[in-house]
Amino acid sequence: MHKIPKGTALAFDFGEARIGVAQGDAELGLSHPLATVTGGSNDEKFAAIAKLVQEWQPRYFVVGLPVHADGTEHEMTHLSRKFGRRLNGRFNLPVYWVDERLSSVCAESLLSEAQVLGKKRKSVLDQVAAQAILHGFLEGGPAECFNGREG
């Protein structure tokens, strides 16, 4: 269990094509889906993220780390870590990485219960996965912090 930072957080479900974003606050005990970032280049994606950072003024980021069922890392794990390091480098905010193994399953379940179907489901799936990642973090699940220094 980790100490939950105070203030607003932005959480990310990173993918090469789409990045789901959620916003939340531990003190309020709330989190909600926010946006799905798409775009061709990393610069376009980070420009969209910069607008969200400006609007929500987060104190930290939470990034989901995809791993195999046995906990071992793979290519997307490394890309997610790289994304988190870029967030830290661009915005100078700490990044907490959390295991996202069940976030997509949780998101699918929530959307099924809410009867969100078709194109609408696809458009919000990554956002709801980011919300699940953030919810797990705010509930005190395991996390690893990166603040610009390896080690």
Swiss-Prot record:
Range of residues in the leader sequence: none
One function term, GO molecular function aspect: nuclease activity
Assigned keywords, A-Z: Cytoplasm, Hydrolase, Nuclease, Ribosome biogenesis
Subcellular location(s) per record: Cytoplasm
BP term (GO), one: rRNA 5'-end processing
Xref: InterPro entries: RNaseH-like_sf (IPR012337), YqgF (IPR005227), YqgF/RNaseH-like_dom (IPR006641), YqgF/RNaseH-like_dom_sf (IPR037027)
Pfam families linked: RuvX (PF03652)
Stated role: Could be a nuclease involved in processing of the 5'-end of pre-16S rRNA.
Name assigned to this protein: Putative pre-16S rRNA nuclease
GO cellular component, one term: cytosol
UniProt family annotation: Belongs to the YqgF nuclease family.
EC number(s) recorded for this UniProt protein: 3.1.-.-
Chief subcellular location: cytoplasm
